[in-house]
Amino acid sequence: MAQVINTNSLSLLTQNNLNKSQSSLSSAIERLSSGLRINSAKDDAAGQAIANRFTSNIKGLTQASRNANDGISIAQTTEGALNEINNNLQRVRELSVQATNGTNSDSDLKSIQDEIQQRLEEIDRVSNQTQFNGVKVLSQDNQMKIQVGANDGETITIDLQKIDVKSLGLDGFNVNGPKEATVGDLKSSFKNVTGYDTYAVGANKYRVDVNSGAVVTDTTAPTVPDKVYVNAANGQLTTDDAENNTAVDLFKTTKSTAGTAEAKAIAGAIKGGKEGDTFDYKGVTFTIDTKTGNDGNGKVSTTINGEKVTLTVADITAGAANVDAATLQSSKNVYTSVVNGQFTFDDKTKNESAKLSDLEANNAVKGESKITVNGAEYTANAAGDKVTLAGKTMFIDKTASGVSTLINEDAAAAKKSTANPLASIDSALSKVDAVRSSLGAIQNRFDSAITNLGNTVTNLNSARSRIEDADYATEVSNMSKAQILQQAGTSVLAQANQVPQNVLSLLR
């Protein structure tokens, strides 16, 4: 080997080896400090790509597990609302069973129907207001896809159905609808009439008031029997007193001499009393609200059928000398029953279609019966259990004020009782049960999906760890080796750097 000064080959070789051991030491320290075998693509290009795909799957599956838990929450929210709907349906069914019992009065049936209506409205409220994260879960049909995988198409569908009164087939559910009219139902109270028709029974004439718009003449109220009957055999009217030949005449108080008598009586009470005093007249207690002068003018009020009625007496001079029917004015449509003299009024039903006034079946026999009221001919069948008008079956309905009225089958269709109420409720319960069962099954499916996702994430983490995580035993060994090589290399480099000094010995 030539003895040279300019190039120290041994030193260069030692430096190169020292750099290699330095690189190994740096790599080992980096892996030990990060815990990763692959800290950059240069550490393992293929391994880095594989580990990165595992990371994508792990993150996607972890989020999918959270999505599945959200799916369980949606199903639980919906099922909870359906449970409350089910409770309301069970109560409606219980009430329907009660309503089908023949011992119920009209008042009982109305109370039952009122509660049923409230329960049905609550079902609609629950349907409309139940939501999860702003999504209404029962107000419309909807298929909600829940992503339960890390890739496209990996979903579970929650089938949400619209559940309300209409979708359950309970729209118009009624256990207290109008019933078919019978001859015995052809009656209404005096308070519903303003006009009259005239009927002949033998040589006698009977007037029965209906809403005909005819002017009621100022006639003295006659003495009448308690009831007027329609004979099922021939449709003729008769009274319960065969020898009574007095005409039946119903009248409005302010258009008759009876109204004059009432005006005088009320004016006299006002004249003899003071504001705030009370007095009784024909079974009704009146209060003097206003007294004008000393001639009997003023206002009195009372409560009839649950509403306040004010009667005004005006334009009286010189005592009660000029009192007549027109003197007494009412804030409501006040009528007087010619049977018992009691005051009645009804503001809502006075303009309804023609009604028979206080007619009652009596001794129904074979044969079809007919009666004409204000030009409308009502026909009762031979048994008296069905009444028709213009070929359409008539039904008895009750107004909001409790007055029985006649309506035809077209109007009754919208109000009629549900044909098979218990079957309708059972059908609704079955639909709710089916939806609840579906939601229960989907919750179990989500539970299974979450378990599987957890297992998959665990296995993928293990696989990724084997690729990119550092083996500390190996790396510590590599670091120790590199450290020793560094120490040795440094020492040898010092020796190599001294080799050129040997050339000086040749110059001595």
Curated annotation (Swiss-Prot):
Keyword presence, Transferase: no
InterPro entries: Flagellin (IPR001492), Flagellin_C (IPR046358), Flagellin_C_sub2 (IPR042187), Flagellin_N (IPR001029)
Other observations noted: Individual Salmonella serotypes usually alternate between the production of 2 antigenic forms of flagella, termed phase 1 and phase 2, each specified by separate structural genes.
Pfam hit, one: Flagellin_C
Name of the protein described by the UniProt record: Flagellin
Record keyword Repeat present: no
Reported function: Flagellin is the subunit protein which polymerizes to form the filaments of bacterial flagella.
Membership in a protein family: Belongs to the bacterial flagellin family.
Cellular compartments per GO CC: bacterial-type flagellum; extracellular region
Key words of the record: Bacterial flagellum, Secreted
Organism lineage: Bacteria, Pseudomonadati, Pseudomonadota, Gammaproteobacteria, Enterobacterales
Subcellular localization: Secreted; Bacterial flagellum
Organism: Salmonella berta
GO MF annotation: an example: structural molecule activity
